[in-house]
From Swiss-Prot:
Encoding gene, per UniProt annotation: SEC22A
Residues of the signal peptide: none
Protein's job: May be involved in vesicle transport between the ER and the Golgi complex.
Phylogenetic classification of the source organism: Eukaryota, Metazoa, Chordata, Craniata, Vertebrata
Family of the protein in this entry: Belongs to the synaptobrevin family.
Organism from which the protein derives: Macaca fascicularis (Crab-eating macaque)
PTM sites of type Phosphoserine: 6, 8
Name the record gives this protein: Vesicle-trafficking protein SEC22a
Ranges annotated as spanning the membrane: 188-208, 227-247, 254-271, 275-295
Keywords: Acetylation, Coiled coil, Endoplasmic reticulum, ER-Golgi transport, Membrane, Phosphoprotein, Protein transport, Transmembrane, Transmembrane helix, Transport
Length: 307
């Protein structure tokens, strides 16, 4: 029989469980799935906002939005469209009931356990398709899942549960590590946003001066072609610093220092065309953005909450 078995609401940044259904079974398979719940909660910050983990006879589905993740366990034959429609209802109700300040400042696990009442009512509706079919329209959800299907989490990415062996576990290098394409950075700070804007400004200034240098060269005013290259390299370096500030990539800190070195070299070559204040501004902004890239690291692992 296809059905929803349990659901949880978890804070993304640290895996703190905010609420959960309390009527789950105590079978061996269910207990193993609860351990997968715990492992997923530690990696939510590194995963896409819509995912599915298949664990044999059960599927774990979740969606994340505004720093909160909504996770559910169902049988493997439960329809995907109903599973994500169920999660969507939980999300809408939770956002309506609790503001972001409450969820961000919560310190105790299950501090919104009263939300379990809504989880239970919604779960009963979705486990009774006859009463459900006339009350919701699934066409939008079907279209959304077709256009943007949930990311399939492999056991390699999840790693092996502590003390748990699974027939679906496989040996692979780097198990438990999420690819950099799905890695998330810590929330941007005000200084990071300022650095991003200043780096864009420096890139724009370099680009404008580069076009002026091309114009001067065409008019045979004697500008060196190497100046044009230096201006455009400076533009590329500033834009790449913006990219590193926003997105996670391998060897990110090393790339940021190399990019800052390129900015310094370009400004050293352009010292005849810029005064000391201009040189100081460009180099200082480059150093500031490099610092912000170094400070804004990938979100770390969550504490070991018993989810």
């Amino acid at each position: 029989m296809s059905m929803i078995l349990s659901a949880s609401v978890i804070r993304v940044r640290d895996g703190l469980p905010l609420s959960a259904s309390t009527d789950y079974e105590q079978s061996t398979g269910m207990q193993e799935c609860r351990k997968y719940f715990k492992m997923l909660s530690r990696k939510l910050a590194q995963l896409p906002d819509r995912c599915t983990l298949k664990t044999g006879h059960y599927n774990i589905n979740f969606i994340s939005s505004l720093g909160v993740s909504y996770m559910m366990l169902c049988t493997d034959n439960y329809p995907n469209v109903l599973a994500f429609s169920f999660l969507d209802e939980l999300q809408k109700e939770f956002i309506t009931t609790y503001n972001m300040m409450k969820t961000n400042t919560a310190v105790r696990p299950y501090c919104f356990i009263e939300f379990d009442n809504f989880i239970q009512r919604t779960k009963q509706r979705y486990n009774n398709p006859r009463s459900l079919s006339t009350k919701i329209n699934l066409s939008d959800m079907q279209t959304e899942i077709k256009l943007r299907p949930p990311y399939q989490i492999s056991m390699c990415e999840l790693g092996s549960a502590n003390g748990v062996t699974s027939a679906f576990s496989v040996d692979c290098k780097g198990a438990g590590k999420i690819s950099s394409a799905h890695q998330r950075l810590e929330p941007a700070t005000l200084s990071g946003i300022v650095g991003f804007i200043l780096s864009l400004l420096c890139g724009a200034l370099n680009l404008i001066r580069g076009f002026h240098a091309i114009e001067s060269l065409l008019q045979s005013d004697g500008d060196d072609f190497n100046y044009i290259i230096a201006f455009f390299l400076g533009t590329a370096a500033c834009l790449y610093q913006c990219y590193l500030l926003v997105y996670y990539t391998g060897w990110r800190n090393v790339k940021s220092f190399l990019t800052f070195g390129l900015i310094c070299l370009c400004n050293m070559y352009l010292y005849e065309l810029r005064n000391l204040w201009q040189l100081f501004f460009h180099v200082t902004v480059g150093a500031f953005v490099t610092l912000q890239i170094w400070l804004r690291q990938a979100q770390g692992k969550a504490p070991d909450y018993d989810v």
